Amino acid sequence: MSLNPKQDNWQGKTVWLIGASTGIGRSTASALHALGARVIVSARHAKALDDFVLVHPGKTANGLPTAVALPLDVSLDGALQAAAQTILKAGSIDCAMYCAGTYKEQRATEFNLPTMLEHQRINYLGALQMIDAVLPHFLVRQSGHISLISSVAGYGGLPKSIAYGPTKAALINLAEILYLDLHSKNIGVSLICPGFVDTPLTSQNKFNMPALITPDEAAQEILKGWAKGEFEIHFPKRFTLWVKAIKMLPYRLYFPAIKKFTGL
């Protein structure tokens, strides 16, 4: 049973992707553009966004560019709201996807509050800012889709993840509540929980990353999930299903299993 309206026709739709200069965000924007969507790409790195636009030319029937760079810093209050107003002046937003994120390995023995708060600002509070920017528009239209990229790191506590993991767990809880409250309003909500994807963030890992996939592969998994109307889109399943299974264990078994599974 589909939990969301199936998103399988992107022709003429406008999708705003925040955190689209690299990785999953950029690959998803590229894949959506190929399917006929008008993509608005946002991130801090303006040159990377401009480069994306250069290799994704095209005009809509109304003469609007099919790829637009809208640089911003998600950690600045009001930045996403101002950007949303800029987009809405030219039309509507059909889907908003929050891909922005930061990640730094950190153990509890190396607790660093500034690092913790930076993760909160970018990974979680930025998502709240995006929702604040687009949700009133979606409620008026009685349509739209909110997509949040979390991680399997949000399923349960993992070593070296004290800054990153809690922000991803918060996104999972947030997405569940959004779905419960917005489904009756015909607003879709999807939660994306990747395993290891070869991105600039994961390149800093000094441990083996099982079932590592490319950003392009991740984008295709996301598109398939949207087309099926899934709420949670997790991949690659040969890895994520194991993580889900371990999380079902009682804590007396979970903690040793995680230590053995991660080797950390």
Regions found by a protein language model. Give the residues of each.
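Conserved glycine-rich Rossmann-like NAD(P)H-binding loop of the short-chain dehydrogenase/reductase
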Residues: 37-52
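Conserved glycine-rich cofactor-binding loop
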Residues: 21-22
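C-terminal helical subdomain
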Residues: 191, 207-242
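Active-site helix of classical SDR
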Residues: 131, 167
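Residue(s) in the substrate-gating loop at a strand-loop-helix junction
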Residues: 151
